[in-house]
Amino acid sequence: VVLAASGTDSELLALALSHLPDAGQPITTILLAPEETGSGVPMAAVGRHFAIDTANGHDVSRAAPIGGFRPDTELVSVPLRDKYGIPRPATDIEDEIGCAVAAAAAAGRRVILHALDLSKTGLLAPSMALLRKLRARFGDALDIVVDACQMRIGPSRIRAYLDLDAVVQITGSKFLTGPPFAGAALIPPRIARRLGRGRLPSGLDAYFSRGEWPPSAMAARGLPEGANYGLLLRWRAALAELRVFAAVPEARKSDVLLRFRAAVEAAVARHDIFVLQTVADPAREGGGWDALRSVFAFAVRAPGSMDRLLDPAAARQLYHWLNADCAALFDTGRDRSIAARICHIGQPVALPDGEGGQIGWLRVSAGARLISGEPSHRGLATDRRLAREMGDLALVFDKIALLRSHWDRLAQFDPRPRYR
């Protein structure tokens, strides 16, 4: 296990592993739906700074090359949606992935294939069956990295990826509901052996310290001594959430997720201004709670035009107002009560609308705490707790409908968000 300050930082780690024991081969990185992963992932995937500062406090230039990484790394993007924002057929996606891997390997390049489990809107690709075929065909010429940063995945799935010699990226801050900026990479033994030789790219000293790497990782000896203690504490909190979640019976996990889905669909149906995105359950082998949909993206019809959906800028404005106490702008007690609530949901994802523009898709998702509970729920019976949670979920959509109906007034005063 190697700890990283975020899922994007772990992307640098995955690329660095492909430079060991030396960087003798040019690299092709294949990313799936980069618009549905972290915004900095495409830059990190080719060895470039993805922000203006780093986990170790270095000031850097965004998109500038990071020292020690090959400058000729090639990026290939495979979209998971068509120009209308609709998920592409799995067969088309997997054919494109297979062709991209084969073309890069034929050109004498080392290939890093990034599987996505899951995207910001709940998409999974490619299938485990394709990953097995690619591993059998290309062997050590192919590195597989699984972006499981959503952590909407059970331990048996993670084990199956590791058995394919895939590096699995995880975080503690999304499904697990731990503090933000807690990433890690799970490295299978065959890949971990690379850490015994060579040297990691020199520029990683801006992102990692020795304490985040196993003591046996000789390739990390050039990193600064010490550790990111804030990262360690954030993971301690996330692991506490994981332990409580793991203790919940599997059938109960599935029951709660199905109840959440029904609550989302009911809340959306109460208003005619929402469009719920159609996404299938994750196509996994076998059943289990992680084969159920837990992320629900929705769009909002624009004020004054039921034929148009909010674009990303307007959706982001609405997202900020959801996180603001807007009660002062309303008159009736009911409206003031709804407007006062702070509603924190998933930030909008920009997807194409088929006409050259984009739609901002907001998201609600089930987290581990919905299933396992948290300290403020102590003393509540499970059904009563869930009824309260589903009531809060319905209120999110009620507040959106209220804000939309007073859009011009809100735009005039623009209440500021306060995250608490």
Residue positions per predicted region:
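Active-site C-terminal subdomain of aminotransferase-like
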Residues: 173-289, 403
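Conserved small-domain helix->loop->beta segment predominantly found in fold-type I
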Residues: 244-358
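Short, flexible/disordered intra-domain loops and linkers
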Residues: 84-88, 245-252, 306-313, 373-388
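Short beta-strand-to-loop capping motifs
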Residues: 187, 298-302, 366
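Conserved PLP-enzyme active-site core in the AAT-like
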Residues: 2-7, 14-222
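Buried hydrophobic packing segments
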Residues: 10-18, 234-239, 393-399
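PLP-dependent enzyme catalytic core of the Aspartate aminotransferase-like
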Residues: 349-420
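Low-complexity, serine/threonine/proline-enriched polar segments
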Residues: 39, 46-85, 227, 286-288, ...
